[in-house]
Structure formats: structure tokens, C-alpha cells
């Protein structure tokens, strides 16, 4: 069973995670209260251009935080990666799951969003009724904003950007 993508939707004012996978489904709420799909989409649009730093969840990056993230993720934080990340000290930073966690208030990695899925199906089913759903694949997550586009915190060389879903394999 290979998980390809993930989506979000609202059900009675609750945000529900839905990783897309065939043919099984699993239901589990991710967040409740006043968080809406419209709010998630607006949040993502507002964060376009935000620097990507692996492990960041929307906080202002400091040297202390960067050092902690490097200790926690030594495989990612090579000397080259750290040299790129240090440029973002003093700015709000995020990684892919942090973009969503920043909005929901639930700090999670992309796999945690997968684990809290409500339903799974193939990305082939993506359509315009799914605006605001989060697209998931192993190790990465983004938010579908319609017309074949998503917003994703893509990587340290890209930051948070609008991408064609078809260009995000």
C-alpha cells in the first residue's frame, strides 16, 4: 500500500485530514474549533515567500533554534544546509508540515498528518471540490488551492511557494 497524496476538508466546521490512498479509508479528526478551510488557504497564501528550514513550524529562527534543529536532524543539517539556513535567522521559517501546523496549532510532521488521516484515495481523484485539502506524499505535504495549484514549503532552496500539483510528484 503506497500513500501518494493527502487532502483536507471541512466537516461541520472541523478540519479533517484526508490522505489519498487506495483503496482503504481511516477516519480521525485533526483539529476542531474555529479553523476552516478558507482560513487554511488564506494562511498559506499569506505565508508565500516564507523561508523553508527543516523542522521549523513558523517560529522566528534564532541561532539557538537552528542549533537545536541541527542536533535533532543531523542527516539533514549538513554544513552546506546550515550555511543556507543561517541566512534566515531573524525571520519566521517553516517546513512543509510546519506550514499547516502553524495554522492549526498542532505541531506535527508530515507523517503525523498521514497517521491522523480520515480517508485515503489516489491523487487521480483531485478536483475543484477539494480546494483547501492537503496533498501528502511520504516526507512532504502541501495545500491544494484549486486550478491544479498547491502551496507548499518546498525546501531550503525554494521556500514557501505556489506550485503546479503536476510538478510536485
Regions found by a protein language model. Give the residues of each.
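N-terminal capping segments
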Residues: 22-97, 101-106, 138-139, 151-157
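Short, Lys/Arg-enriched N-terminal segments with co-localized hydrophobic residues
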Residues: 2-6, 12-32
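Loop/turn positions that initiate beta-strands
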Residues: 131-133
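Short, surface-exposed secondary-structure edge patches
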Residues: 120-129
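Catalytic Cys-His active-site segments of thiol-dependent hydrolases/isopeptidases
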Residues: 143-168
Amino acid at each position: 500500500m503506497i500513500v501518494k497524496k493527502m487532502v483536507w476538508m471541512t466537516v461541520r466546521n472541523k478540519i479533517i485530514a484526508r490522505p489519498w490512498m487506495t483503496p482503504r479509508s481511516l477516519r480521525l479528526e485533526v483539529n476542531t474549533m474555529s479553523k476552516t478551510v478558507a482560513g487554511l488557504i488564506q494562511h498559506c497564501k499569506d505565508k508565500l515567500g516564507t523561508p523553508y528550514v527543516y523542522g521549523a513550524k513558523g517560529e522566528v529562527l534564532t541561532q539557538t533554534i537552528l542549533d537545536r534543529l541541527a542536533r535533532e536532524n543531523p542527516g539533514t543539517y549538513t554544513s552546506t544546509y546550515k550555511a543556507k539556513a543561517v541566512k534566515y535567522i531573524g525571520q519566521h521559517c517553516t517546513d512543509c508540515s510546519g506550514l499547516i501546523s502553524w495554522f492549526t496549532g498542532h505541531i506535527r510532521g508530515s507523517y503525523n498528518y498521514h497517521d491522523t488521516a480520515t480517508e485515503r484515495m489516489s491523487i487521480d481523484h483531485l478536483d475543484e471540490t477539494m480546494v483547501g485539502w492537503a496533498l501528502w506524499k511520504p516526507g512532504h505535504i502541501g495545500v491544494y488551492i484549486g486550478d491544479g495549484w498547491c502551496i507548499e514549503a518546498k525546501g531550503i532552496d525554494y521556500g514557501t511557494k505556489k506550485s503546479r500539483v503536476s510538478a510536485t510528484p
